[in-house]
Design a protein with these regions (language model features):
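N-terminal, polar/charged subdomain of small-to-medium soluble alpha/beta proteins
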Residues: 2-146
């Protein structure tokens, strides 16, 4: 990383208050759903891999080894599967936004990064996908610059 990039990062961070947080990751979650904008994609379900990371606005030292004190990823998987099976979705971007909305259902989640990839569409030649990084509306943690 160049010194100029580091200086920009430091400059951006100095005005933002530091609050304790930790991150939860869910990786390699594969769901089968009806997705795709093209007619030939509507005829059969496709496998999609979802990876996500949530920044949790909570001091991990205050959790006290209690499941009730943390954001549960178990229920999160069930909610994502329900959305995926509820209807046809045209775009990966739409699915990623809906996954982010599910994550923001817990008030402690302040930022979500979601990657969604179609696993079977190009016969193994390539894996198309998108990455979405979004902050909770009104959060002090602004979304990154693209």
């Amino acid at each position: 990383m160049s010194h100029a990039m580091m200086a920009l990062m430091i400059d951006d961070a100095k005005d933002e208050p530091v609050t304790p947080c930790y991150r939860i990751r869910l990786e390699d979650f594969v769901v089968t759903l009806s997705i795709g904008a093209y007619e030939h994609e509507r005829s059969r379900p496709q496998r999609v891999r979802i990876d996500l990371e949530m920044a949790i606005d909570q001091d991990v030292s205050a959790i006290g080894d209690r499941l009730s004190a943390v954001v549960s990823y178990d229920g999160l998987l069930d909610r994502i599967e329900r959305v995926a099976s509820s209807r046809h979705i045209n775009l990966l971007e739409t699915l990623a936004l809906e996954v982010a909305d599910i994550c923001f259902g817990d008030a402690r989640v302040r930022r979500v990064a979601v990657s969604v990839k179609k696993l079977d569409i190009f016969d193994g030649r390539a894996v198309p996908g998108i990455h979405l990084d979004v902050a909770r509306p009104g959060s002090r943690s602004a979304a990154p610059r693209c």
